Regions:
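Polytopic transmembrane helical bundles with strong interfacial aromatic enrichment
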Residues: 1-338
């Protein structure tokens, strides 16, 4: 078997785990398995309303945040169960297998690849722990944000291993850089991450997605309740206004980076990756606007737009971060003075 394809397979599985996690959020199913690692004390997901009531009666300290009489549908429980199945029963064992293969079966691999395999194993264990914390803390904003951040860092460890493994097999890219290259990409990476994490608070805080109103253009977008959204009284409830201002700031930074791209990115491949990430960011801005302005009194928000919004935001961060990894592993600095 061509084991060097394993990191890419794990990246795809991780993307599926993140997507299912987003689905859990839009269906309000984050607490549909109140215990961990089981679901209402069962291995399966088919838990009736009566069985849920019996479990709550036996576990009075685990009251659902929506009240003791709240019940979940089979589909809601399935989304959380499937999320755990992908992460714990498929992704986790494959990461362990990858670690064993890299450490024991491939002596020709570099020490860097072996360290990355170890890091990915440590991170998937950490991610499982954070998943447990998220359940125990009833999907608090900070725990959900930390869970997503950890998933992205884990994904980056797999991307880095994939690139390093390919380099060990002779795929040397020789990417030209200058002293400005890492600096500029780091700014874009941090900016996209901050926007993503604040967006997580918007999506997990009750009422935050309506904090700027639902009256369409221009009252609710691009304005925030008919104002510029500068007066902040409640950081969580008004996180949408903060999110929008951060998006605008990062957009200006990305426009500046695009305008000066030949100054800081001599390698065409890095410029292309930066351009792809920038256009992904801009497209996601439009998607975020569409999410707000398509609200109706009959059906509310189109929540699938929210999931795609999350995935595109994650993709933007991962593309910028992957550019940094490529430069770290394949970069050739021309030693230009800034």
């Amino acid at each position: 078997m061509r084991w060097h394809h394993l990191p890419m397979l794990l990246i795809l599985i991780t993307a599926a785990v993140i997507a299912v996690g987003g689905t859990i959020r839009i269906y309000d199913a984050g607490e549909s398995c109140p215990d961990w690692p089981l679901c209402f004390g069962k291995l399966g997901f088919d838990v009736s309303a009566d069985e849920q009531a019996a479990w709550w009666a036996e576990n009075p300290d685990e009251i659902d945040s929506r009240g003791e009489n709240h019940r979940y549908t089979t589909f809601q429980i399935f989304t959380e169960w499937f999320h755990r199945l992908l992460a714990g029963s498929i992704l986790g064992p494959l990461v362990i297998l990858q670690f064993l293969i890299v450490r024991k079966k491939n002596p020709s691999l570099s020490i860097e690849s072996k360290r990355l395999a170890t890091l990915s194993l440590a991170l998937v264990i950490w991610q499982g722990f954070i998943g447990f914390v998220t359940v125990k803390w009833d999907n608090e904003h900070w725990s959900v944000a930390l869970h997503l951040f950890s998933a992205l860092i884990f994904t980056l460890s797999l991307i880095a291993l994939d690139i390093s493994w390919r380099r060990d097999r002779g795929h040397n890219l020789k990417i030209e850089t200058v002293n400005k290259t890492m600096n500029r990409l780091s700014i874009a990476t941090v900016g996209s991450l901050v926007v993503l994490l604040v967006g997580t608070f918007v999506s997990t805080t009750e009422g935050a997605n309506q904090a700027c109103g639902v009256s369409g253009i221009p009252y609710s977008w691009p304005l925030c309740s008919g104002t510029l959204g500068l007066f902040i009284q409640d950081l969580l409830i008004q996180s949408q206004a903060i999110h929008r201002w951060l998006v605008l700031i990062v957009l200006c930074i990305l426009a500046w980076l695009w305008w000066t791209r030949f100054d800081w990115a001599p390698d065409e491949r890095i410029r292309k990756l930066s351009n792809i990430a920038t256009w992904t960011f801009i497209s996601n801005m439009a998607l975020g606007a569409a999410y707000v302005i398509t609200w109706t009194s009959e059906s509310g928000f189109i929540e699938w737009l929210s999931v795609i919004h999350l995935l595109l935001a994650s993709l933007t961060f991962l593309i910028f971060s992957s550019s940094l990894i490529l430069i770290h592993l394949h970069g050739i600095n021309n030693n230009e003075e800034e």
